[in-house]
Amino acid sequence: VGKENVYALSGGINWFDSHIDDWIIWLPTTKGFFSPRNLKKVHAYGAETNAHLDIMLGKDWKLDMNGTFSWTPSINESEPMSPADQSVGKQLPYVPEFSATVTGRLSWRTWSLLYKWCYYSQRYTMSSNDYTLTGYLPPYFMNNVTLEKQLSFRWADLSLKGSINNLFDEECLSVLSRPMPGINFEIFIGITPKFGKNKNSKR
C-alpha cells in the first residue's frame, strides 16, 4: 500500500516447519574450544514477519524503515543417549526462540544516517535447558548507529562510513563466559573502481 512519491508500506509473514536428520550443533567445551555434536532428529519450525516503510519527507530527503520478528523453536527430537539424557524435547542450546530487528535510514542526497536495534531472547547453554545461574544467557538488546557519505569521481566511487556499535554500552553475552565488546567504533572506506567506463562513455 502507499501513495506515489509520498510513502510505500509493505510486509509479509512466512511459516516454516522442518524435520531435520543429523543436525550438527557446535557446543563450547571446558577446554575453551567448540566441539561438534550430532543430533539425530531436530524439529525446527516457526514464523518470521517483516515490514518495510518508505517515506519521502521532502526534496532530497527520504526515510526507510524495516522491521522483522522471528519465532523459531528448534527442538531436539532424538532418542535419549542414556537414561540421564534430559535434552529430548528441549530447545537447542544457544538458539534464541525469539529475535527482532528494527532499522531506520534517513537519507539526504549523498549522506545517510542508519540506526539499527536488535533483540535476542534468552538462550540456554545446556541441552537439558537447566534454568540455573550458568544454564542460560539473559536476553539482550543491541543498538548501532552508522553515518555514511557517498563520493563519486571519474576513476571510482567511494563510500565512507563511521559506526558506533553497542551505542549504550550494554553488557551482553552470546556465548557463556565470553562477554561481547562494550561500546566500540569502526571506520569503513569502500572503493569501487570505474575500469573502462570513461572509454565507453566517449564512444
Regions found by a protein language model. Give the residues of each.
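Residues on the lipid-exposed face of transmembrane beta-strands in outer-membrane beta-barrel proteins
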Residues: 1-3, 47-53, 102-108, 115, ...
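Outer-membrane beta-barrel translocator domains and adjoining extracellular loop/strand segments
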Residues: 23-32, 76-85, 116-117, 124-132, ...
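C-terminal beta-signal and adjacent terminal beta-strands/loops
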Residues: 118-128, 136-141, 147-203
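Extended alpha-helical regions
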Residues: 16, 20-27, 42, 169-172, ...
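Gram-negative outer-membrane beta-barrel transporters
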Residues: 5-20, 37-124
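Short, solvent-exposed coil/turn segments
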Residues: 32, 44, 65, 97, ...
